[in-house]
A protein has these predicted regions:
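Conserved N-terminal beta-strand and adjoining loop/helix that marks the start
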Residues: 1-20, 42
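Short connector loops at helix/strand junctions that flank enzyme active sites
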Residues: 6, 34, 89-93
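Short, acidic/hydrophobic/Gly-rich beta-strand patch recurrent on exposed beta strands
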Residues: 22-25
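A conserved beta-turn-beta hairpin within the catalytic core of GNAT-like acetyltransferases
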Residues: 27-31
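The catalytic Nudix box helix
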Residues: 34-71
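Active-site-adjacent beta-strand/loop module that shapes the phosphate/pyrophosphate-binding cleft
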Residues: 72-105, 117
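NUDIX/MutT-family hydrolases
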Residues: 95-99, 106-138
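Short, charged, intrinsically disordered terminal tails
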Residues: 148-149
Length: 151
């Protein structure tokens, strides 16, 4: 088994009206999150990782991807550490935004996610279980204004 690379992406899928798509994890019902996933060896760069994960987890391919130039480092939960090389305890997460024209029904991979919700950014921020995901969503209004709705 190849070990996972301890580098990942978090992609906040949103509309210009600041509605955010959240996905409910299949292995942890009740845990809601944005699109996430690990970099793979054949990904050309982190943007490629983000686009691959978007396609795999939601089927979404039409939108504007923006690198937020935001990086988080967090401890990998003990129950997931066997997926990584011995001694790896932390992951580096790179945050992206993905602007879509309207709320779109995602095509979920049932092995990964069992439900989806579009919520106003404040509600999405409260619903997500991950502190880094909450922080990213909290920055959405400023990023949309700063970049003219292309966050």
């Amino acid at each position: 088994m190849a070990f996972k690379i301890p580098e990942s992406v978090l992609v906040v899928v949103h509309t210009a009206d600041l509605d955010v798509l959240l996905l409910e994890r299949a292995v942890q019902p009740g845990f809601w999150q944005s699109v996430t996933g690990s970099r793979e060896p054949d990904d050309a760069d982190l943007a490629a990782t983000a686009l691959r994960e978007l396609k795999e987890e939601t089927g979404l391919a039409v939108g504007t991807l923006t690198d937020w130039c935001l990086t988080n480092r967090y401890e990998i939960w003990p129950q997931w550490r066997a997926r990584y090389a011995t001694g790896v305890t932390h992951n580096v997460e790179h945050v992206f935004g993905f602007l879509v024209d309207r709320q779109t029904v995602a095509t979920l991979d049932p092995a990964e996610h069992i439900a989806q919700l579009w919520l106003p950014w404040q509600e999405a921020m409260r619903k997500t279980f991950s502190p880094t995901n909450r922080d990213a969503i909290s920055q959405l209004p400023g990023r949309v204004l700063e970049r003219g709705s292309t966050a």
